[in-house]
Amino acid sequence: MHLNSSVPQGTPGEPDAQPFSGPQSEMEATFLALSLSNGSGNTSESDTAGPNSDLDVNTDIYSKVLVTAIYLALFVVGTVGNSVTAFTLARKKSLQSLQSTVHYHLGSLALSDLLILLLAMPVELYNFIWVHHPWAFGDAGCRGYYFLRDACTYATALNVASLSVERYLAICHPFKAKTLMSRSRTKKFISAIWLASALLAIPMLFTMGLQNRSGDGTHPGGLVCTPIVDTATVKVVIQVNTFMSFLFPMLVISILNTVIANKLTVMVHQAAEQGRVCTVGTHNGLEHSTFNMTIEPGRVQALRHGVLVLRAVVIAFVVCWLPYHVRRLMFCYISDEQWTTFLFDFYHYFYMLTNALFYVSSAINPILYNLVSANFRQVFLSTLACLCPGWRHRRKKRPTFSRKPNSMSSNHAFSTSATRETLY
């Protein structure tokens, strides 16, 4: 990406450096759309935006091809993985008892990830990577695109957090979990997540809109999907979005998964040191209840595996989403006077990197969450084999092990199947 030589060398945003007519300076006009996570700016090649386009924002062809190849790979992996996950959870009745109600959370997460890939990635590739403007989908398409993208982003983050809450209750408070995590309550909770996500995304319907920023205001090449409110309002929207779709979910995920990992680690150590017997306890007011449970060697290995998966979940969420939100917050906290040509170029390519990581999150979630349950993984691969006959021949045969029921003693009636639901 480079700026045209015709761009004045003074401070970005000065009145004499206006590529388009309108209230924003050149940097404001460019970064308003960039900072809302979708776009390479409101400016493009001078021959398409009108005679007064002094700012040329170009991505070199090699970067475009590389980003396109990465996006296509993520699109294939993500859509196949999330589609098969959703299909598996909806059609396979053998999963109705999978990890208590965790299959509802997995299904909701797969749906939000799938919608992000289907709704956001194609539009971004076309109108923000290859053809900066004119915007090709009209004013309704502009508002609807940002609304749906933000709603699905909120839903993904909140679904990951809700899955952590479900696992925390199931592992650390198994008695309460049986009461709190009923199927009907879980369905209502997930419905509330989607409703909250839609409500949180409503501001995008009024923040974004179609404007013509060509010199005379009529050139068709100057149509851009851009913020139609003042810069201060845009910054508020960005910061609220960052808090609700990243900081808050990350705090919940990090705390709960740390507690879960520590609990599983203690259980593994107890099982290894005390003859495969671990103790699970719960508090109910003044009453303290405990039960001992014998765990087989295979189950101990599964517990160790569960600890690693939980750590991977936290790391993946932070690695994929932190750069994305850091890049957006750059717009909020870097003043116009601090933007240089070098920083502008860095921002543009940093945009492509962070958005690629953002889509990695949607593509990798099926892999991470399929690792949580061996039962789910088995049914997932079985479904994939049915949908893709060629996959059946590539699957390696794995030895099967017979498992004896877990034995336990407790002052509460607690079934073996219920106990298995609290463990990975």
From Swiss-Prot:
- One GO BP annotation of this record: response to food
Which pairs are disulfide-linked? 142-225
**Post-translation: what modifications?**
N-glycosylated.
What are the lipidation residues for S-palmitoyl cysteine?
Answer: 386, 388
Q: Which GO terms describe its cellular component?
A: axon; axon terminus; cell surface; cytoplasmic side of plasma membrane; dendrite; dendritic shaft; dendritic spine; membrane raft
Q: In which tissues is it expressed?
A: Detected in brain and small intestine.
Q: Give the record's glycosylation annotations as residue positions.
A: 4, 38, 42
Task: Topology check: give the Cytoplasmic ranges.
Answer: 90-103, 166-185, 261-308, 370-424
Q: What are the entry keywords?
A: Cell membrane, Disulfide bond, G-protein coupled receptor, Glycoprotein, Lipoprotein, Membrane, Palmitate, Receptor, Transducer, Transmembrane, Transmembrane helix
What Gene3D superfamilies does its record include? Rhodopsin 7-helix transmembrane proteins
The segments labelled Disordered in the record are 1-23, 397-424
One Pfam family named in its UniProt record:
7tm_1
Main role?
Answer: G-protein coupled receptor for the tridecapeptide neurotensin (NTS). Signaling is effected via G proteins that activate a phosphatidylinositol-calcium second messenger system. Signaling leads to the activation of downstream MAP kinases and protects cells against apoptosis.
Query: What's this protein's name?
Result: Neurotensin receptor type 1
Q: What organism does the record attribute this protein to?
A: Rattus norvegicus (Rat)
Name the lineage.
Answer: Eukaryota, Metazoa, Chordata, Craniata, Vertebrata
